[in-house]
Design a protein with these regions (language model features):
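Residues that cap or delimit alpha-helices
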Residues: 1-2, 23, 76, 169, ...
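A short, conserved structural fragment
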Residues: 84-94
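Type-3 copper protein
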Residues: 80-81
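Intrinsic-disorder/low-complexity, polar/charged segments
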Residues: 3-5, 19-25, 118, 182, ...
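Winged-helix-like regulatory helical subdomains adjacent to P-loop NTPase cores
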Residues: 13-77, 92-97, 101, 114
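The conserved phosphate-sensing helix
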Residues: 1-12
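Extended amphipathic alpha-helical scaffold segments
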Residues: 67, 92, 113-429
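Basic, glycine-/proline-tolerant helical and adjacent loop/strand elements
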Residues: 100, 105, 109
Length: 429
């Protein structure tokens, strides 16, 4: 299990010898044994059914009213003492709530499960029922959908139907899509249904992934920063479908580029998907270079070519051979004296030096240094004219170029420049 919180509960809750089949099964055990005090009710002289009703009341009232906690007076004193003693709720200034968000999520899952079973396939009745709680139900519904992808029966009878049934309200269809793409288990869904998903549905899932398949984490070191991290397995599956041209690469160009860029930022990547992602981006790079040659000018496209190059550079493990050949060609073009109008070489070399991604520097350190040397050294073919002005800093005397003289390294020095940092950190010199 990847969640340390679960591991702690397995040990502290006495689940070490339990036959836990999957996360859903374990969450059911958490609900019965920990949250509802199944084995400890007798100790406090309370009924488990009363504990369950109390927990549900605390959770639903707090969520529907969007408050930090609910009044402790609404809870029976014996049940309140039991829940506090077992670490299920916390109290502050006579306000109580469940101690962990995950406890509340499990409570909502149980509620949604019951409403779903009671609807007997009338999904709009199901949605009307759970919507009575208020807007707070949307996020919990997404979590419920994410976990339902475990169960094959649920995928066949429910999730696929929600995506294709036109009688389902648009807002619930959207919430279903969000739940799918945020799930780490949605690969099971794509594997079974990708042949049945038409281009429109795939495009919708692509856009939803780009908008919602992230989680925010607060980082307190060295300053307070919120990091937004891509999550879920949707990108991996969608990239495979894009690579097979299940949707138009031209029509969905912006969305596909973002999809691949976000995948490049994922902590866990597979070699196969990474290779597909960078090859998709290379196709766009080649198209822009050809377009620039036809227009006889790179000015209109150089910024976009550089951005696409940096996406590929983030996936340097898979794209190493292409990056080496591409940057070497840029170095040759730059040294040949080709003007900036006729080549994007200078912009690519500047990107390597000023925005060098970690993996590029780690996989191709010599090429990174060679790019800097080429950019900062004088070109043999470069002629100096009177209007170039006096060489105040003697850069030309030292064999350096204007790029070296005007290189913006601001007040933070090596700590604000990735290339310098990697050179210093990794002993490239």
């Amino acid at each position: 299990l990847p969640i340390s919180f679960y591991l702690n509960l397995i040990v502290s809750g006495g689940f070490v010898e339990e036959n836990i089949n999957d996360e859903n099964n374990f969450r059911n055990l958490i609900w019965e044994r920990i949250i509802c005090l199944k084995d400890k009710c007798k100790k406090y002289g309370v009924l488990q059914s009363d504990v369950r009703k109390t927990v549900e009341r605390i959770v639903f009232e707090r969520a529907s009213r969007f408050v930090v906690g609910v009044d402790s007076d609404i809870v029976d004193s014996d049940i309140l003492e039991a829940l506090k003693s077992e670490g299920i709720i916390v109290e502050s200034r006579n306000k109580i709530r469940l101690k962990y968000d995950i406890f509340e999520d499990i409570c909502f899952e149980r509620y949604i499960d019951k409403a779903f079973d009671a609807c007997h396939g009338s999904y709009n009745v199901f949605f009307d029922e759970i919507e009575k709680i208020g807007r707070c139900i949307y996020r919990r519904y997404q979590i419920w959908i994410s976990n339902k992808l475990f169960v094959q029966e649920a995928r066949e009878k429910f999730v696929y139907t929600l995506l294709t049934d036109n009688s389902i309200e648009a807002k619930w269809k959207k919430q279903t899509e969000i739940g799918i793409v945020k799930s780490k288990y949605c690969g099971l869904f794509f594997k079974e249904f990708q042949e049945l998903l038409d281009e429109t549905v795939v495009e919708e899932l692509l856009d939803i992934t780009n908008l919602y398949a992230f989680e925010a984490k607060i980082n307190h070191s060295p300053a307070l920063i919120m990091n937004v991290t891509p999550i879920g397995a949707a990108r991996e599956n969608l990239i495979g479908m894009v690579f097979e041209e299940r949707i138009s690469l031209d029509k969905n160009r912006t969305s596909i580029i973002k999809l691949c860029d976000d995948y490049a930022n994922c902590f866990y990547k597979t070699a196969d998907t990474e290779e597909k992602a960078y090859k998709i981006i290379i196709r766009y790079i080649d198209e822009l270079i050809e377009k620039s040659k036809e227009e006889k000018s790179y000015y209109q496209h150089d910024e976009e070519i550089v951005q696409l190059f940096l996406i590929v550079a983030k996936m340097a493990k898979s794209s190493k051979s292409w990056l080496k050949e591409f940057v070497e060609n840029m170095i040759v073009e730059y040294c040949s004296g080709t003007s900036r109008r006729d080549s994007v070489a200078e912009e690519i070399l500047k990107a390597v030096v000023k925005k060098c991604p970690l993996l590029f520097a780690m996989e191709l350190p010599e090429l990174a240094c060679k790019s800097a040397e080429t950019l900062w050294g004088q070109r043999v073919s470069r002629k100096h004219f009177r209007y170039d002005g006096y060489d105040h800093n003697n850069v030309r005397a030292y064999g350096l170029s204007d790029n070296a003289n005007h290189f913006d390294n601001n007040e933070n020095g090596v700590y604000n420049n990735t290339f310098f940092w990697y050179v210093m950190r990794c002993d490239f010199v």
